[in-house]
């Protein structure tokens, strides 16, 4: 039986720090790796929306916080539709599932049935819309979808960060890299890789998480094969 993996792609990662919302080079690199993984893995992807809109950015535009969160949710649906279009162009079978109704972009709403059916069809499953609710982060959506699809491992691709440190290595030269840690340690030391809701869900469902630099060469493949630099978080 093929292992089930859930990959988190951040919106910021999709833009690769460019002035455009999408980086074709980044997406082509990810797709090339997915093509190698599809024969041996069942793959789910949770997509962020930060390249278009962040819920926390509402004050920058003088809009209400809840409006900002809803726009952030819709941004993930746009990203999911874009990612599916890229997969289609490469003849990678995929299903886009959204936590919010958006029939013109995502024809299916996330449910246990639609998730199970997509995997039975051997599709890559793209999860958009976060949890469908404002004030919940994409991290929480990752933990929720991983639980629903019974993922064997979660891969969280960070934009330019190769794992977990005791402090921000860009601000603290004494920050130490952590190759592994438990959820209890992450929560106790307030290591802000994921929010506490997501940490708690992952811990309760005994999920393993690998944090790695999505921009590194062959990053996803190396993380899965336990090569290169990464942090493993488990119960």
From Swiss-Prot:
Catalytic activity: UMP + ATP = UDP + ADP
Binding site residues for UMP: 49, 131-138
Residues the entry annotates as binding ATP: 8-11, 50, 54, 159, 165, 168
Acetylation keyword on record: no
An example molecular function term from Gene Ontology annotations: ATP binding
Top-tier EC class: transferase
Protein name: Uridylate kinase
Gene: pyrH
């Amino acid at each position: 039986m093929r292992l089930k993996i859930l990959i988190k792609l951040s919106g910021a990662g999709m833009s690769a720090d460019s002035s455009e919302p999408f980086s074709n080079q980044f997406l082509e690199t990810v797709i090339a790796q997915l093509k190698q993984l599809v024969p041996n893995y069942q793959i789910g992807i949770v997509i962020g929306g930060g390249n278009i809109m962040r819920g926390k950015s509402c004050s920058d535009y003088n809009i209400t916080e809840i409006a900002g969160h809803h726009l952030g949710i819709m941004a993930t649906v746009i990203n999911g539709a874009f990612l599916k279009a890229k997969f289609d162009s490469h003849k990678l079978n995929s299903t886009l599932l959204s936590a919010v109704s958006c029939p013109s972009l995502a024809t299916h709403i996330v449910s246990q049935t639609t998730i199970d059916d997509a995997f039975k069809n051997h599709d890559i499953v793209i999860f958009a819309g976060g949890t469908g609710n404002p004030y919940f982060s994409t991290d929480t959506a990752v933990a929720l979808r991983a639980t629903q699809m019974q993922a064997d491992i979660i891969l969280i691709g960070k934009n330019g960060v190769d794992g977990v440190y005791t402090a921000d290595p860009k601000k603290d030269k004494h920050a130490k890299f952590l190759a592994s840690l438990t959820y209890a340690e992450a929560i106790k030391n307030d290591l802000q890789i994921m929010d506490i809701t997501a940490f708690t869900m992952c811990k309760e469902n005994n999920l393993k998480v690998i944090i790695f630099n999505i921009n590194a060469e062959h990053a996803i493949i190396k993380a899965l094969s336990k090569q290169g630099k990464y942090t493993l978080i488990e119960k």
